[in-house]
Amino acid sequence: DFSFCAGIPNENLLKSIPVRDFMLIAANNEDWYPMIEHTFGKKAKKTLRYAIKKEPDIFDKEYLKSIVESLDDDYEIRQFDCEVFELAKKENWSVDLCSQFENYQDYKERALGVAILHKGQLVSGASPYAIYKNGIEIEIDTKPEYRKKGLATVCGAKLILECLANNIYPSWDAHDLRSVHLAEKLGYHLSHSYVTYECEFSK
């Protein structure tokens, strides 16, 4: 879902990108921007994303544990198991928690994640949106009516702890300033903003 353009701008290269309903396109220099806008027209919306520094030793484990322990007793936090995986697939708000995996077996072999349930209902989760050697890109989503309750913070803290316990780096890339704020709350630091094009082809 994410394409990164580098080198000399090339329109044929842009046109060769496999089209999906939604994808993100970024580039290493602004010379690409006019070509991206010309190639995709109104389907390409110019936005800012925020790169977060990769600092393996900055996390305060005791602080993160205290966040997890602050979760209200009305909620249950658990590992991303088969039941949670199937629940995540069923709703639009949560599908990205598992969309990069063929099935639960694939998820179990390559990923790790955490979820918060309320009365048996999945209400928040943190899971890999991308996987690379010794690291993941964190995806956090919360059911709309359960937002602003601190659930995303708890999920993020728990997944970071799980990653550290398994020698996996929990990488973070923020799509907006709210995501930056959450990242900073968990111990990360902002590096810089960068231009991205959100391209929708489903409309």
Where are these regions (language model features)?
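Acyl-donor-binding surface of acyltransferase catalytic domains
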Residues: D1-L87, Y197
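A short, internal acetyl-CoA/4′-phosphopantetheine-binding micro-motif in the GNAT/acyltransferase core
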Residues: F4-N12, E139-K148
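Conserved acyl-CoA
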Residues: S16-I17, V154-Y169, H189
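Conserved GNAT acetyl-CoA-binding A-motif
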Residues: R20-N29, C163-H175
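Conserved active-site alpha-helix within GNAT-family acetyltransferase domains
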Residues: P34-G41, H175-S193
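Terminal substrate-recognition subdomain of acyl/acetyltransferases
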Residues: K53-K54, K185-K203
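Conserved acetyl-CoA-binding loop-helix of GNAT-fold acetyltransferases
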Residues: I138, K148-E162, H181, K185
